């Protein structure tokens, strides 16, 4: 008789002695699932690197001064099943009411085909931002559908590929207007009926930039000397205003008109682009994305074509590939922070791609007629309810789309009656209520809403006699969504196959490792994702009364405590919904702290030249002066230069922004000295948390002298990247900065449902539209930390360090690692310097990146932080087999470069310069290259077993930026190319005959 004793090193070890029940109840199963290499592989890789244990390797890499001497004070890890049971108990504490609060958030039905095949599909949610165009054609097509949808519905000429939320988009619109308007005024006028969260973000953004806000009615804006104006259309109370005269007046004085709008409403009412708007922003949430207690949702911005080089966020454009076929790419990237740094149009990096894809597919699935039916039904329900209330003597707004504004009532009593019936209304004040209907509303909902007011609603009878409540002069007459993509995929089979076709074009982590340096593309475990779609998390309105989200409260409190323990900080805000917004929040906290001490003069931010582009861009948004610090030959912060500049700017020094480990992939020995220098001159130390995956369980920034960090839950703590968002960028601070974390909106909190303030008045405004940012994906990080436990988190960090050093060591005979730390080791990533190879062969880092596609790999980070290099970050989730596959590909590529050097391959017509190679090219009747098809497509034998074929050849970036087109490709563009190719084949066959 025998029993399973234990699992060891991937092999089942048998013992003839009975194991204890405690041994069989193995709690470390998830850790072994998350960490790629098993113990045998770890031992083998350690031998390659030259160490006998993870502990000895960690001691060799991490400076002793900053190493944690005690384990994380977190519980032991638990199994997936136990964690799911535990979070189910938390979720059940939330109470899902029917929410008619509105204020920018509306109920929606997520089509199940989109839920299963986009939101729950790792082919979509594990992809990265589409910097590598050739392996991102599928999601870029989905995003260009999103851009076309937004541009069509708003009546504008161009739209971006998503922003973080509507309020952030409005703040970006204000900045765009300031940059682009002819007026030199510093005054920005804000409609007094914008959503409250939008006004809060405008206030946060305006003050550091020297912009003066004035809030008032559209009539008051007629005579204002402004550089821009923001209108809400329909407004937060549901009114649909005619703003044509105002738009003309603003334009006459050199200002720009920005409008916050609603995509569903714009199917019925005149789009802002047709009555004078220059910029339109909004939220696509009601196109199939749940409330999620505030997010994530895809905001958007559309504008006139003349502002395309100033619009923030990513733009998908159309170019051509090397074969002349249409191909998508990121357009006009020189606007963005990773290139323009403090001169960028915005600090935005991560946006909301996954949610934009969902919204675009909602429009594709329903098409223009389906959207019209949803919009008219929503409006009809609102009109019927309004008629019933008016019939009972209540005062309701005259014109509206979906939102009723009821005045002159006992709002408290009615609000309480609605809550007792399981419904949430918007209480504006003691005498005013708002009711916003949506596509989920039923006839019984309308009857129940009437009963709350003591009114009997006969839906059928009222439908027969009630007129619509849209203003006749503002009805939409223009067509929208006319492209075939919105008029083809309306059956589930058609959409299912369209989604599969798009996903098959791309490389995501369900196919291959994505070794992007500074991006931490680690496992997004399925168990972590499961709670996200539970209705107890997905269906809570962000402005619901606090008694309805006690489960969220517990989860948020526990996650904040976990993150504080991992970082050594004292307080956390989960409001920032991207890393860039976390940076922004941290710098605002520093700014407010200095001002609270009467040191307004402190506005200089020191930033190393190696920093991520969001650092200087965020500092600029806070009104800070950016001063660059040099790096030494080893890639470290030049301490002498730092000391000199800290002394020079001693009276005005606000902060130092430093990434740790550095963006050069090393643990700098002088980090504590760096912090001391900055503190000695009155500054605060901001540690960018982008590389926190090298620190968890090993070192805590809050303990070595750092005052504030942002974290990337979409990197270190396993929220998926989603192809470019969502993300969560918590701001973590020491105690003295805690009072300066972002404020929150008042929420209905007492028994009567009256708005109440928090226990402490915040001194810094909101940085995201919702109090807890992208709250519905916080369960992902909670699950990860809970399942890993203290020991698992430390081991994950150690294996991340090991994997990076293993790659560097194995590639050392072939590629130089640009920077190393102590003992010739790197941190969790390494920079491969291919510049010497380019000098002798002409092969660039970009050529290597494109060639890796032929091997089935997403490229490492290209030309950051050093131009002409490749930065590799494998993370702890990749097995030795996958690491070896990558190493073998890189060695093969080095061999091809050597063949060019020796003259065995042509300097131009070689597989690197011509990469990537499509199936169409390889199988064409003619092969015009000086190398074989086999070398092009199957440079390694393993590729015969599993081969990824890129859908396009190398994309022409120059053509794309010279011929900017950011909407769906006309079908004729494909047809013309196909016709010409067919004609060529006919002629070729004829010549053979």
UniProtKB/Swiss-Prot annotation:
Necessary cofactors: pyridoxal 5'-phosphate
Molecular-function annotations in GO: glycine binding; glycine dehydrogenase (decarboxylating) activity; pyridoxal phosphate binding
Listed GO CC annotations: cytosol; glycine cleavage complex
Swiss-Prot/TrEMBL catalytic activity: N(6)-[(R)-lipoyl]-L-lysyl-[glycine-cleavage complex H protein] + glycine + H(+) = N(6)-[(R)-S(8)-aminomethyldihydrolipoyl]-L-lysyl-[glycine-cleavage complex H protein] + CO2
Gene3D superfamilies for the chain: Aspartate Aminotransferase, domain 1 (3.90.1150.10), Type I PLP-dependent aspartate aminotransferase-like (Major domain) (3.40.640.10)
Keyword Oxidoreductase: yes
InterPro entries linked to this entry: GcvP, GDC-P_C, GDC-P_N, GDC_P, PyrdxlP-dep_Trfase, PyrdxlP-dep_Trfase_major, PyrdxlP-dep_Trfase_small
One Pfam family matching this protein: GDC-P
Protein origin, superkingdom: Bacteria
Protein keywords: Oxidoreductase, Pyridoxal phosphate
Modified residues (N6-(pyridoxal phosphate)lysine): 715
Record-annotated disulphide pairs: none
Keyword Oxidoreductase among UniProt keywords: yes
E.C. number: 1.4.4.2
One GO process term, biological-process aspect: glycine decarboxylation via glycine cleavage system
Subunit text: The glycine cleavage system is composed of four proteins: P, T, L and H.
Function of the protein: The glycine cleavage system catalyzes the degradation of glycine. The P protein binds the alpha-amino group of glycine through its pyridoxal phosphate cofactor; CO(2) is released and the remaining methylamine moiety is then transferred to the lipoamide cofactor of the H protein.
Family the UniProt entry places it in: Belongs to the GcvP family.
Protein name: Glycine dehydrogenase (decarboxylating)
Gene designation per UniProt: gcvP
